[in-house]
Amino acid sequence: MKRTGSKSVRALAAVAAIVSLFALQTVPANAGGVDFRKAVPGSGKGLTIGLIGLDDAIGFGKDVHDSIAREAKKAGATLIFCDGKLKADLALACAKTFKLKKVQGYANFNAVADAAPAICKAGPQVPVIAIDIEQDPCQAAFMGADNANAGATTGKALGEYFKKNFNCEYDAFISLEDYGVGIANELRMGGYRSGFASVCGAIPADKLKKYDAGRLDKALEVMPAALTTLPGKSKIIVVAINDQGIQGAFSAAKQVGREKDIYAGSQGAEKSVWCDIKNNDHWIGATAYFPERYGEIVVPYLIDLIKGKKVPFQLKVKHIAINGGNIEKYFGKISC
């Protein structure tokens, strides 16, 4: 039986559709997060490791890449990076390159979950750590989000905000999803709803509006029409599978003069949106994934796997809800 982990990010790219599509997958009980551990200098000397990147054009993906490169260098390992750019065919080509380059282990941030079997087959038969998206059947460990808990963290923050400010009254709950990333979408977006419901009760079906539009470009496309269906409404909740979806939502709302009508929650809290979170009091929460520290989990555990050491399958990040009031507590002084 397959073990199911979790996911991250703009690309990353409903519930019923995903349940049907991934009927053979099972969702494990939530495991506690692991602590970050910096690579031990010299621990990777003589080793060659690989990284199939999400997309370096995306802030989250670039932060992950940079952190893994930093820790690999510290460990003394040679890192071969290949950017998947959100495309299955490019990720497949990366795996083939790793085989030719004789990498001894690699991390895979391929964005297309159903392409994982082909990628696993094409690549070298070495230890693999999946990042944020399932990479069955070859993943030896899953590193990334505890998706259900990540969604619930900011979903609850939204519920608490609406309870305090509006007595839990709202006009719509717009969910910008990414069906292409598999069960991670169901867990993360369902987590938003369960977290919100824990404070304000279940979301009525007529208020829930779901779109396959978690990415920046997709959110820019669908939000104007979505807002058109809600004329005169000023308490609209918008959640997205990543930060970029919410950037797109606010940009689209601003174009039609309605940026103050939406209240948002996102996933990632990546560096590229820190100023947005700090300065926009309608960006109620963003679940922190700390992509700039992913390398502090991926690199030391991948080296352990290559050396034959036992590693927990679940290597999940400990999530925190970030907002304008606490962002500098966790990320330091932010100059915007």
Question: What positions do the PLM features span?
Answer:
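Loop/turn elements at helix/coil->beta-strand transitions in domains of secreted/extracellular proteins
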Residues: 47, 75-78, 101-105, 124-128, ...
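Hydrophobic alpha-helical
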Residues: 108-124, 128, 192, 209-276
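Hinge/beta->alpha junction and helix N-cap segments in small-molecule ligand-binding domains
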Residues: 52-66, 80-90, 112, 144-153, ...
